[in-house]
């Protein structure tokens, strides 16, 4: 991907390109000019000693405490230090890179009062490969992601920790390694850096991308299972779908028809049975519902990726500063709870398909897909693992956004818990990726008994991609590496790419 331009409409593929693939980020002269106007306004407010929250006053419960011009720099530095109290394991580098990009995008809109040189340093972190160390726990999701963003910002002033070329360093040493010097923050800058929803949105945007891959993967895995079990694709007929106006259902049915077109394994009604069980017959309805939910999440996150979410906001054209609540993460929190539920359901139905594959009473195939049952257990325990993962997801799918707890002496008396929702959704997605990997493993093995050469062209491509990484099961072996290999095949998009090279783009 070409360089990502700050200040233009930021897209999900651009976030992924910067976060995961190191795409460069550029600042245009227009963005610098916009940012400078708001910064000049802040300087004037300080000179005029106008009472403005976070610029000439303290924060939270201390919002009525006046701050002199001489205390401005200390106020901003103290803000970063005092708010950097997150705990837990560090967020993944890709998440922190997404945070940096999203915070820079919000600041580039010119309503935050940050200086151009401070924004340029955030961009330099991305382009030079300096990744702040950000612990994952400690955000309430209002006022934004204060603690995570404080940790993200500490290296700007030579504090905290950062990773450069895989080495974890002090903030000061990390700056030195990449040829940068610490900044001295001026009025409003500390607050502008940490008051926003970028931790939850970073986690959510990368999770959304992965969920979109899982949607296609779930259709591919289900199509392979359907062929292995001699399913009846009549249930996916477009005339059936047209009588229900859910677009996600219709898209899922189109995918399934495309994936199984040309199959010599699927059957007609009455050929083997009159109708299939729900896990095969209702695939468009279940996968489609998740698809519709994820499309809603995509819209919410697209808005949030391009939002200005700090407080107060400056409007230089009107010479006005307004204290608002754009930092409140409730829209994102609700969406990410929805994301977790939608993806968890993809795993729930996949686990039931796995059971149909390994259970001889349901499949008509050898028990646990091994030719020598008794001495060999075959794929018996893979279903246990899938059952464990989907059961864990039932706990993780409990919504975080219905919770709230007051903070800052009850000044900040309702919070979103959006970053908790984001972290849970990320784990649900990782779990479902492995559930689908197990289904792919089982479906490919089941096909060894019915003839993979009879697969549809699209699912034959999926089978070939699987067999490049995992051999057929001839006897018992350690299966954990097989599951992880197929989970990576899903995660890196290679399975979907192999299928789409034959079938064309899936929806």
Swiss-Prot record:
User: What Enzyme Commission number(s) appear in the record?
Assistant: 4.3.1.3
Residues recorded with modification 2,3-didehydroalanine (Ser): 143
Q: What class of enzyme is it?
A: lyase
Pathway this chain belongs to: Amino-acid degradation; L-histidine degradation into L-glutamate; N-formimidoyl-L-glutamate from L-histidine: step 1/3
- The source's superkingdom equals Bacteria
Which cellular component terms (GO) are annotated to the entry? cytoplasm
Q: Which GO BP annotation is one of this protein's? A: L-histidine catabolic process to glutamate and formate
Tell me the protein's name.
Histidine ammonia-lyase
Recorded source organism is Symbiobacterium thermophilum (strain DSM 24528 / JCM 14929 / IAM 14863 / T)
